[in-house]
């Protein structure tokens, strides 16, 4: 089973949401990214997501910005394949980001 940020494992049968307020490797295993929810403390707070384990070697998937003090859900038209894991780089003025993802085993079975 794919790993989780806390070192546990996640069954490959459902989407999950991982919240964070700091830079974080969401998973080291292949996965699909379904969307993000950005909670910013100021307009323009930003979060950048990568296919990989860090910002330096990962493939940038996109930078997502939010308005202040509201939930900013960002859905993707279709899941994005992340073959090298998912890394989130929390930028300025972010209270929390919720990363919606699922292990690749589930994605392949759908």
Predicted regions and their residues:
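Tight coil/turn sites that cap or link beta-strands
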Residues: 20, 69, 83-85
């Amino acid at each position: 089973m794919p790993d989780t940020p806390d070192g546990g494992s996640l069954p490959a049968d459902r989407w999950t949401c991982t919240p964070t307020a700091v830079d974080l490797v969401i998973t080291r295993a292949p996965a699909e990214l379904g969307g993000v929810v950005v909670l910013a403390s100021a307009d323009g707070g930003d979060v950048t997501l990568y296919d990989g384990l860090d910002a330096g070697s990962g493939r940038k998937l996109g930078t997502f910005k939010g308005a202040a003090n509201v939930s900013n859900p960002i859905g993707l038209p279709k899941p994005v394949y992340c073959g090298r894991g998912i890394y989130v780089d929390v930028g300025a003025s972010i209270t929390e980001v919720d990363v919606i993802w699922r292990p690749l085993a589930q994605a392949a079975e759908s």
